[in-house]
Curated annotation (Swiss-Prot):
Residues 62-73, 134-152, 225-252, 309-353 are cytoplasmic. Residues 334-353 have a biased composition (Low complexity). The modification N6-(retinylidene)lysine is found at K296. It comes from Solea solea (Common sole). A motif ('Ionic lock' involved in activated form stabilization) lies at residues 134-136. It is a multi-pass membrane protein. Keywords: Cell projection, Chromophore, Disulfide bond, G-protein coupled receptor, Glycoprotein, Lipoprotein, Membrane, Palmitate, Phosphoprotein, Photoreceptor protein, Receptor, Retinal protein, Sensory transduction, Transducer, Transmembrane, Transmembrane helix, Vision. The record marks E113 as: Plays an important role in the conformation switch to the active conformation. Phosphorylated on some or all of the serine and threonine residues present in the C-terminal region. Contains one covalently linked retinal chromophore. The chain crosses the membrane at residues 37-61, 74-96, 111-133, 153-173, 203-224, 253-274, 287-308. This is Rhodopsin. The keyword Cytoplasm does not apply. One of its GO terms (molecular function) is G protein-coupled photoreceptor activity.
Amino acid sequence: MNGTEGPYFYIPMLNTTGIVRSPYEYPQYYLVNPAAYAALCAYMFLLILLGFPINFLTLYVTIEHKKLRTPLNYILLNLAVANLFMVFGGFTTTMYTSMHGYFVLGRLGCNLEGFFATLGGEIGLWSLVVLAVERWMVVCKPISNFRFTENHAIMGLGFTWFAASACAVPPLVGWSRYIPEGMQCSCGVDYYTRAEGFNNESFVVYMFVCHFLIPLIVVFFCYGRLLCAVKEAAAAQQESETTQRAEREVTRMVVIMVIAFLICWCPYAGVAWYIFSNQGSEFGPLFMTIPAFFAKSSSIYNPLIYIFMNKQFRHCMITTLCCGKNPFEEEEGSTTTSKTEASSASSSSVSPA
């Protein structure tokens, strides 16, 4: 083993020199330069500085404007709530611990940070899955005359919380565990050890299959079918410039969604799986730290993609920020009108939300 395993921690450094110390009790500056901890603290501060106002604004604007309180936007709000969970439950904790150079909050703090970060990330992930299924059901109409109602939205919300809890709760009750990872300033699922009594192997396999591969397959299937539906609608009206424009816009939106999904989760999942399947191999603390915190940046670009590309929401947001007046109202209105005309073949559901 090319690391040091202790009670409720694993440090990616052999203790041949005797300098390895518990990440709950001592600064870990022997792992990386102290400047790296300062950089991590600054990065977390940036995520808080950007993530909180973006997601809070999403909630505030939706509450203020009644026309935004639609069933589909319930899921978008759920995404914002999930991101706020990550901001308050994960980012603030990591910023504080990185200031000290170790997980100063102890074992209980590690459990709480790992739980809230995992819960927020999983709620966000499954919210994207529900959005993908909704787009597929409405646009492609596998069930004729299907209409996404408030009851469907509530069921979708319940499903996201159930699925997220099914991933975040088990490490708290003995199926796997949360331990400090990377630079030892944040906590995640134990991919690193085969500690007796925790069944880490079975939980990691369950987590990858049920909470990564299945969501990925569903998202690809739904958006793949959505692209086909848009192309078919455009082919039926080849002389309509607005339809062709709608096809290009939706194609661009879907490509951005899928790429963001992959960029957010694949590096972290790939590194975690490598560590799990090559336990005992040599790797540095930054090997897991960089993809883990890159995945956490989804709290910023998720709302930008899934909400700010929504013309109606953007109009309401600008109106709120400009004290009741949208200086771009005419442009926004004409764009929305053309979008509605272009998407008539699919009941105006081709355009983003």
